[in-house]
Amino acid sequence: MKNPLYVDYHDHERWIPNFDDQYLFEMLILESFQAGLSRECVLNKRENFKKAYDNFDIKKVCNYDENKISELMKNPWIIRNRLKIKASINNAKIFKNIVNEFWNFYEYLKTFTNWGITHETWKTTNKRSDNISKDLQKRWMRFVWNVIIYSYLQAIGVINSHEDGCFLN
C-alpha cells in the first residue's frame, strides 16, 4: 500500500464500524461503482464523486433526472458508466425506502442472521453477504452482488478482515 489515500482509508476508515445512513449510502454507491475495478481506482475518485453526487445526499440523488445523468456522464473525474450511474439513482430510491421501512439502514442490515462484527480473512462472500445481496436484488437494487455486499460489509466495519500482523487487528 503506497497510495496515501489507500493507506489513510485502511488505517482510519475501512473495517471501522460506522452506521450513519449517509455514510452507509456513500459506501454502497462507491462499492457498486467498484464492480470490475480496483478499490484504489474508486478511492482516487472519491472526493470527485462526493462533489458530483451532492455529498451523497440521498434525497438529492433520488431526484436525479436525465439532465443530471448527462452531467455525470460528462464528468471526467468520476467513473462514467451509464449503467452504474443509473443504478446509483435507482439504488438511492430503494435505500430511502428501506430507511423508511426500518428506521435506518443499519436496522435493516441487522435483520440478517449472525449479526455482529466478525473477523474473517481471505473470503469474498459469506452467508450474510449472500442473503443481503439476494434481498437487495429482490428489492430491485443493481450492482449489489454478494461479493460487492461482502466488500461493503467490510467497508462499514461489520466484517473485520485485517490480517494477523496488521496493527489494527
Give the residues covered by each predicted segment.
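HhH-family (HhH-GPD) DNA N-glycosylase catalytic core used in base-excision repair
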Residues: M1-N169
